[in-house]
Amino acid sequence: HALRCMVYDFAKAYMENPTGEYIEEKAAMCKLFSIDTTRKVSDEMLEIFGGVGYFEDCKYGPVERLYRDCRAMWLEEGAPTVQRITISRNTIKHGAHMEYVL
């Protein structure tokens, strides 16, 4: 639910002013939150199922595929470090006018 609210807030800000000040950092915050949450959930899922969950033919479901897709998303969307740098750079540039603090 938190990510959905962040995405709606970003979309609203973008629709009101596509070249607005906080568009870049709001997008980075959404991406960072989604990447971190997905990684945590997939790691916990793999821990619950143990080594058996990582086999492709696991009878418990597609644990291996979801974990692999999560890692691919982590690389595709940009490492969380890049997102954190973007957020911190823009926070310093704009001062303390940010709505979100991670």
Task: Identify what each model region corresponds to.
Residues H1-L102:
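Alpha-helical interface subdomain recognition
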